[in-house]
Amino acid sequence: NFSLKFIEQSSQIKSFNRNGDSPKVYIADNSEIFIDEIVKEIKLCQEKGFQSICLICKTEKNSTYLFNKIKHKLDIQLIKNGSVSDLQGVFILPVYMSKGLEFDTVLICDADSQNYHDEDDKNLLYVACTRALHKLSLFCENEVSPLI
């Protein structure tokens, strides 16, 4: 199970298998390709019939930045505070707001070495990865996190 690499082996967490493809990691050489790859993946997931698609970023600042880059390319909702009542559609939110939620598809959109590099970040990656019910993709610009 992909997400188990982010927790201590001695933990008493029981995992269960999710249906779907193995997670994919996308590495882009520049920000234009990075945004294009994310938009392409969202559209592909919509074509496959996934009803809830969530883009998860480490921070609210990263979420807002990404939202501003892609809001003109597709219908997406930025969640900054409060709760999400209807999990249908495309959302972007920081990882701390994703705990307890599940989505058909999750795209972790800042999975680079700058954002995820220490033990605390390992726990955040675990939370983000386990939000996906069927499909998980990780995106980074330039250098992938050493935790992945």
What residues fall within each predicted segment?
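Conserved AAA+ ATPase "SRH/arginine-finger" region at the nucleotide-binding site
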Residues: I27-D29
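Core RecA-like ATPase module of SF1/SF2 helicases and allied nucleic-acid translocases
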Residues: N1, S11-G20, E32-D36, K43-N142, ...
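Nucleic acid-machinery interaction/catalytic patches
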Residues: E8
